């Protein structure tokens, strides 16, 4: 049993292994098979044989190949495996405003805000909700500019009040006929009393 003062090193570990005689290059002979591209290396029989390493991410005899002079080349003895992995891009810039609600409640909230904004022309809500509802209001106005029956039915499926849809399709072509976007405006205001949430007005241009 080693004493506490003994310093363990790689040389001590290598000395505990059985000695292996090095194979000189002159003792190797090559025999050509039927194909000239395949070469076999015939080694002389030795009393101590090295076991083949596992064909995976395993070192090829790390203790035997590691020397005290070149201790940093341990990672170079690993075999490289190509597992056919693919790298996919991340979803940068595709953030969905959750508004602290599940999907069904979030959609109902955005439908209600869109209906009230198209009905009154200006509403006051939180800044996050105003920025989230702006996309849907612009989409409804773009549908009204198209004026087709299919777009009208799509708007009826999103806006809660039927009269607002008919008034929207009748007024939008004259009001926003020359405008290709930017139908709403967000104006920041004082934060809400109580929880200090940032508030804003969103209105039709």
UniProtKB/Swiss-Prot annotation:
Signal peptide: none annotated. Keywords: Chloroplast, Plastid, Ribonucleoprotein, Ribosomal protein, RNA-binding, rRNA-binding, Transit peptide. One of its GO terms (cellular component) is cytosolic large ribosomal subunit. GO terms for biological process: translation. It is found in: Plastid, Chloroplast. Gene3D superfamilies: Ribosomal protein L17. Residues 1-89 form a transit peptide. GO terms for molecular function: rRNA binding; structural constituent of ribosome. Its main location: plastid. Part of the 50S ribosomal subunit. NCBIfam families: L17. This is Large ribosomal subunit protein bL17c. The lineage of its organism: Eukaryota, Viridiplantae, Streptophyta, Embryophyta, Tracheophyta.
